[in-house]
Amino acid sequence: MNPRGKTFMAAAVAGMLMVAPQSQSADGPGPIPSEVPGPSTRQATAPTGRQVVNFNRDWKFAKGELPGAETPGFDDSAWQAIRLPHDWAISGPFNPSEDGYAGKLPWRGVGWYRKSFTLDQTDRGRRVYLDFDGVMAFPKVYVNGQLAGEWDYGYMSFRVDATPHVKFGQANVIAVLVDTRRHGTRWYPGAGIYRKVTMTICDPVHVAHWGTYVTTPELSDASATVRVRSTVENHLEAESQVDVEVVLLGPDGRVVATGSKSDTVPAGGSQELDQSLAVKNPQRWDIANPKLYTARTLVRVGGKVVDGEDTTFGVRTFRFTADDGFHLNGRRVQLYGACLHHDQGPLGAAFYPRAMQRQLEIMRDMGCNAIRTSHNPPAPELLDLCDRMGLVVWDECFDKWDGTADRVNREPLQQYGEKQIRNFVIRDRNHPCVVIWSIANEIGPQSGQREGMSAENVKFMSDFVRKYDPTRPVGAACHIPQMANQPILDALDLTGWNYGRRYATYRQRYPDKPIIYSESASALSTRGFYELPLPTGKTQYSRKMQVDSYDHNAAPWSDIADREFQLMETDRFVAGEFVWTGFDYLGEPTPFSREARSSYFGIVDLCGTAKDRFYLYRSCWRPDATTVHILPHWSWPDRVGQNVPVYVYTNGDSAELLLNGKSLGRRTKLKEVADSSYYGVTDKYRLRWMDVVYQPGELKAVAYKDGKKVGEAVMRTAGQPAAIRLTPDRQELAATGEDLCYVLVEAVDEKGTLCPLADNLIRFRVEGPAEIAAVGSGNPLSLEPFQADRRKLFYGKAMLILRTKEGPGGSVNLTAESDGLPAAHVTVSSRPVQ
């Protein structure tokens, strides 16, 4: 037993509380799987009559209040034809006079979406549902002119029952009113139907929405008990006798267990059928080997299968302890996490699975093994991807409770929270990646009329989460140390603390409760920007409104990465950290909130191009993976003969630096910090040559570990731009209308060396079954439109995002041109989906 007392333990998909019996011990992210799977649809594949239809095609959109737009006969012929997901604000234009907190984009307003569709006569008598993954904000859904449903939280998924309003064998019209004027935000929220929509057509007797709940109350290496609870709805006027069969499929798709149970479902009601199945020699879901099972649920009436669905789950144990952090499948795992906002950079809030997959691939390459969905429920596909990629998730429902989300002068907090938490938990509880339910972020004590954190509110929210899933800890991200001296946090199973070792006070009051560093760092930098002399303090920022990439700057309330590394080494009772943030995001452009439109916090820029800081984290979080990175660039025509400090980020413990073949000496990382100054800790994690005299040519770093060479890197002085280099992230795409290809655009000299100061305007042309979805450069100050066919390079680089067209596919040819440079070409393939 843990001598500190309370330890939270959990198991399996949403497993029951239990002790993990394994005795093995490990610390770190573990090996990274060599192959990243594509996104999962999580749609039913069981052999039933249920249809799950992609409802993203053939919409029309118009901005404005437009009275009568809900009626079927409304004239929408002049509306814009679009395909979901759609963020109406990302196309701009930017407003230079706006504050940058929400990205300077026109997200406030009213918009209408309309779509016509026809249902077969054979579907008469069946149920028709419309499932929205996320609409920003306050959507009202009309079917054939009748209000069919609405929702009041822009980040939450919801279902609309269209059955009473649809017609069969003739045209139906769905109209969605979206109103962001009442939405409150601290960052760019987007606007519109920004996540996918599906239409589900099923039998009147069917598995309820999110109606399958899988847990594993017992688990050992020899066997696992898998508990499957199936909620069946009956929309008939008479009771229905049902038989529910559950078939468990192993990671290889083979049947590993079956079970069946019968019960009566009352007319117009529902019934839960509870079954337990035994699985021999279970394969565990883990960070390095995320094995997944499938629970196939089949509903029979009168011996005939009338409905069914597949539910993905995983088998694992985990626990958080007060003294030793996080344990997964019996071994300690340090959480190396990143906070991610919901926007996809130049794509805005519009959610594309490939865009998220790419973000997660980049984070995992850095050494990330955990993601925090700050500060809202994510798109369901994010959790699908984390399940498949072996990333654990801090799943967050709300930001502040005092009016910065959709609860603006609305219903009482507890009533609002109950509705959102129900959908949040039952939607996500089958994901093995989810290990924490977070009910809030940075909520201060209750004062005046603000709905802040009170013991009553925290207990209510926590208990309501546990009502739907008692198998995971309930937490919140806190930022006011004084709150630890009050009973406000008593109802939480664990707490996250944001910044500056604020968790120390909480540790004193709650020595038996686990702690996690829910936001760390908030360091700041601009990709490719270097300014000398170096800053002497973390808040000494450039007058050019960019932030130096020598990685010396942070927000006033936060610290540079090295100081956080030191904390995590010292405070081993902390389960790990979630860095703010993995990627730059639209809005919150500290420290230039008036001038800029996107953040400087990211380890990776807005377009997904790594900053220098990426390699600092990689060298620390992946000590067994070769990392050798030199900064700054080596093109300083105005500093010949002057000092240019050189840093090397490496997983090695030492490195030698050579300039034009001449050694500038070998540096070794300190094992202990001798210098107590703010930047003294950097010598433990970086290698620095502060007295390098700049001469053009070749700068080379050779890294060593335990005396053996582990790798090298070279930086060369660039000549004048001579060519455009195009590098697609993938060669083969799917012709779905929603697949993406990210093409890195660079200016290079005649030898192929990146020109790090180039700012050429690049023009693009696409031929074939794809289109330009967006362009960007990672410049937080740029007010160039994202939806365009041209872009200025930012420190030598830009990014173009291609989106496929639905259809037979074919070759996609991209041409890039710039004045004075030869045209560049690249070809990728778009393949039809069978």
Residues of each region from the PLM?
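Glycine/proline-rich low-complexity spacer/linker segments in large multi-domain proteins
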Residues: 28-46, 148-149, 168-204, 284-300, ...
